[in-house]
Amino acid sequence: MSEKGRLFTSESVTEGHPDKICDAISDSVLDALLAADPRSRVAVETLVTTGQVHVVGEVTTSAKEAFADITNTVRARILEIGYDSSDKGFDGATCGVNIGIGAQSPDIAQGVDTAHEARVEGAADPLDSQGAGDQGLMFGYAINATPELMPLPIALAHRLSRRLTEVRKNGVLPYLRPDGKTQVTIAYEDNVPVRLDTVVISTQHAADIDLEKTLDPDIREKVLNTVLDDLAHETLDASTVRVLVNPTGKFVLGGPMGDAGLTGRKIIVDTYGGWARHGGGAFSGKDPSKVDRSAAYAMRWVAKNVVAAGLAERVEVQVAYAIGKAAPVGLFVETFGTETEDPVKIEKAIGEVFDLRPGAIIRDLNLLRPIYAPTAAYGHFGRTDVELPWEQLDKVDDLKRAI
């Protein structure tokens, strides 16, 4: 253990990071298709590099106009992020956009459209007719460390990234560019966050900016201090924090010109910042028939309601599926010794209150809607800036009654 205590670190990135551009494009294409045809089956992957965007994957949809307009959807999202000039290293209006999308495999579709329960076992329940789109395991987590019931390091890192984008877009720091990263290291004592140890903020900027005289003080005042004042965490001492702004020096060459980007390469940023486990599946570009996405959302919904109901101070839940089967093959609940009720009772109550078949998750969270583009940056969980159905605390009373 360090003399400074147990140190835990999480990172976030801005929407202009190359990987996040790809997540945003994939989810914008998904939303456009779902808006026109809620039953669209979508698995879209994006790659960006200098001057080019490649969008590939599998789509089955009746939304012919939206499908034909994918190129314009791609350009619009890039411009919205802020890449609108070659001076910034990328321009959504002039970059090359290559589309290579085919249809969903009929072998996969048969298991999703007619699950094993209906096809082989003769189940009559309509919710037994939709099978999982793949095998896999998904985790959800919640902890009472923040109002949004998220681990503090990732919650703070996301707030810093959102603030970086906010001061760029609203003109407070107009010399900032879209690409950026944040990292937060917090000291813990007995699982309580006690001290903000280190904050790293790296941001792309215009070429003529003086790092020491302008960028460093501006980031401290307009980004870090604003976020810390808003956070006002009761146990966290930030008085001795070490702040590193652009520790490599200048950061002019960024975005796709600085690094190639791919959909699904920021899965820890997307979830719990490494504080909780991850099943390995990415989210962006996937319609909710893919349990990688919908079941991970459902598990966050479960975990958040368990903590909000006072059944545990923190909880991690895992669910697992077999491709083509509706019912989960496994459910695991871990309360880390913080439970206020018997963990066996908590697991039983979860099974009674939440229907974790894919069709039921889609129904209960109303997932066949164009709600995914805002999740492509700043995390899918614990969001305070957008309303997401898996963040609702609508099962607290049901869990209490079930216990």
UniProtKB/Swiss-Prot annotation:
Main location: cytoplasm
Cross-link (Isoglutamyl lysine isopeptide (Lys-Gln) (interchain with Q-Cter in protein Pup)): K345
Molecular functions per Gene Ontology: ATP binding; magnesium ion binding; methionine adenosyltransferase activity; zymogen binding
Residues binding K(+), per UniProt: E45
Gene3D superfamilies for this protein: 3.30.300.10
Keyword Magnesium listed: yes
Its EC number(s): 2.5.1.6
GO biological process, one term: S-adenosylmethionine biosynthetic process
Enzyme superclass (EC): transferase
Amino-acid positions noted as binding L-methionine in the UniProt annotation, renumbered to this chain: E58, Q104, D259, K290
Pathway per the UniProt entry: Amino-acid biosynthesis; S-adenosyl-L-methionine biosynthesis; S-adenosyl-L-methionine from L-methionine: step 1/1
Name of the protein in question: S-adenosylmethionine synthase
Organism for this UniProt entry: Mycobacterium tuberculosis (strain ATCC 25618 / H37Rv)
Name of the coding gene: metK
